[in-house]
């Protein structure tokens, strides 16, 4: 007779006390009952309203303590479910995960969220006609997305509606997340097809170069094919959506009147957001010549996007941060270092260390994602693979940043978690 649930049996072949099995099973049953009670309480309308206000409001930063509690809890539950989910089920997410991305893009392209926002809850018979999708197929698409927490379904009247996640996909939503549902499940999906070739021993080309059949880097290729605007628009929208947390979740008042030099500042949106949020700050921006030529009118012309803070932008500097960096006491660098391998990052960190002006506020603030285990760390892990296939770059762990910083003469003073943003602010101080 096969051993039952509480018989002496383990996968390792080592016998365990029957009472230990009982204790584990009882713990799981108690946990299940407790989770059901909490779930029932959370689903109460007044609790939902409170959570949406404190944790999920699209236009306000979440409560710090509540958000951290939620993240820690999600990570704990994720770690537990990995121990309980059948092995083949773990593999199936890898087999079929691409379908989530393609399903999301299909409904975004058809503007399903927009039609629901305009007309309220609808059955698929009506919604499908408004979106140009076969109603039966739309039901299949939405069934998957509802199970993923995107859109809501009411079985009482067989209607679908927007929820807090799907509302972010509306084309007129200020965050413009719908752009990400296009670029990554399409262009970046195509690039990922070449991942197996790109990681082989002796291969120096990126997956993007292999997929597109070019020796140009990704940015040069996109510019040549007149596709760079879509890429820049998508990443720019993401930067806007995440900007507020970056301006408030670091003690920028510590810098006082010391000017900031934003290295590799790109469009200038990050520097502009800091100056708008903190009237006492002044700054300059450094980037390559083509970028500086592009953004100069935005700061210097009367109708430029950043003309309102243009007088507090002291210089727009042409330069190459892999070679030389102008002196400053305070530097910032956002989403640049993940484009580079460790040796290049070390060179850049050393360049900044050599140039920094000693003062009581001297620091180098690196805005990058930090890899970590658990469900809450999945975005940096996605980013790590994106960097790998597009530019041979990588995201890094906290230990990676400590090690590289110390090799370049920096002490990792503190890491500031940023609400509603994927990167952290890594505060390096000169050693």
UniProtKB/Swiss-Prot annotation:
This is O-methyltransferase gliM. It comes from the Eukaryota. Pathway: Mycotoxin biosynthesis. Belongs to the class I-like SAM-binding methyltransferase superfamily. Cation-independent O-methyltransferase family. COMT subfamily. It comes from Aspergillus fumigatus (strain ATCC MYA-4609 / CBS 101355 / FGSC A1100 / Af293). Residues 20-85 form a coiled coil. Keywords: Coiled coil, Methyltransferase, S-adenosyl-L-methionine, Transferase, Virulence. Its EC number is 2.1.1.-. It holds the Pfam family Methyltransf_2. The keyword Coiled coil applies. O-methyltransferase; part of the gene cluster that mediates the biosynthesis of gliotoxin, a member of the epipolythiodioxopiperazine (ETP) class of toxins characterized by a disulfide bridged cyclic dipeptide. The first step in gliotoxin biosynthesis is the condensation of serine and phenylalanine to form the cyclo-L-phenylalanyl-L-serine diketopiperazine (DKP) by the NRPS gliP. GliP is also able to produce the DKP cyclo-L-tryptophanyl-L-serine, suggesting that the substrate specificity of the first adenylation (A) domain in gliP is sufficiently relaxed to accommodate both L-Phe and L-Trp. SUPFAM superfamilies: S-adenosyl-L-methionine-dependent methyltransferases, Winged helix' DNA-binding domain.
């Amino acid at each position: 007779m096969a051993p039952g649930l509480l018989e002496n049996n383990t996968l390792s072949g080592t016998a365990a006390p029957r009472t230990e099995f009982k204790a584990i099973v009882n713990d799981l049953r108690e946990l299940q009952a407790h989770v059901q009670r909490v779930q029932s309480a959370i689903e109460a309308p007044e609790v939902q309203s409170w959570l949406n206000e404190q944790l999920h409001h699209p236009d306000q930063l979440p409560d710090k303590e509540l958000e951290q509690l939620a993240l820690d809890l999600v990570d704990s539950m994720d770690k537990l479910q990995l121990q309980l989910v059948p092995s083949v089920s773990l593999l199936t997410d890898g087999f079929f995960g691409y379908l989530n991305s393609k399903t999301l893009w299909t409904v975004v392209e058809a503007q399903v969220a927009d039609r629901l926002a305009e007309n309220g809850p609808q059955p698929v018979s009506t919604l499908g006609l408004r979106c140009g999708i076969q109603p039966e197929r739309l039901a299949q698409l939405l069934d998957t997305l509802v199970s993923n927490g995107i859109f809501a379904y009411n079985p009482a009247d067989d209607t679908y509606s927007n929820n807090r996640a799907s509302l972010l996909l509306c084309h007129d939503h200020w965050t413009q997340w719908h752009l990400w549902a296009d670029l990554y499940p399409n262009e970046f999906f195509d690039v990922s097809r070449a991942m197996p070739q790109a990681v082989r021993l002796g291969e120096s080309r990126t997956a993007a170069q292999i997929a597109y059949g070019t020796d140009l880097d990704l940015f040069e290729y996109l510019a040549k094919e007149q596709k760079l605007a879509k890429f820049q628009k998508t990443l720019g929208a993401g930067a806007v959506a995440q900007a507020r947390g970056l301006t408030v979740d670091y003690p920028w008042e510590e810098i006082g009147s010391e000017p900031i030099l934003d290295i590799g500042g790109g469009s200038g949106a990050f520097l502009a957001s800091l100056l708008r949020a903190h009237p006492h700050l002044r700054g300059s921006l450094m980037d390559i010549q083509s970028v500086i030529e592009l953004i100069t009118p935005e700061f210097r012309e009367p109708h430029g996007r950043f003309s309102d803070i243009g007088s507090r932008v002291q210089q727009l500097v042409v330069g190459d941060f892999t070679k030389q960096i102008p002196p400053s006491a305070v530097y910032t660098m956002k989403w640049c270092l993940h484009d580079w391998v460790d040796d290049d990052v070390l060179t850049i960190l050393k360049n900044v260390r050599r140039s920094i002006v000693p003062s009581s506020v001297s620091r180098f603030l690196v805005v990058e994602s930090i890899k970590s285990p658990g469900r809450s760390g999945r975005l940096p892990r996605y980013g790590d693979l994106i960097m790998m296939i597009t530019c041979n770059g990588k995201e890094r762990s906290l230990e990676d940043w400590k090690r590289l910083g110390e090799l370049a003469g920096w002490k990792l003073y503190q890491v500031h978690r940023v609400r509603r943003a994927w990167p952290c602010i890594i505060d390096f101080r000169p050693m």
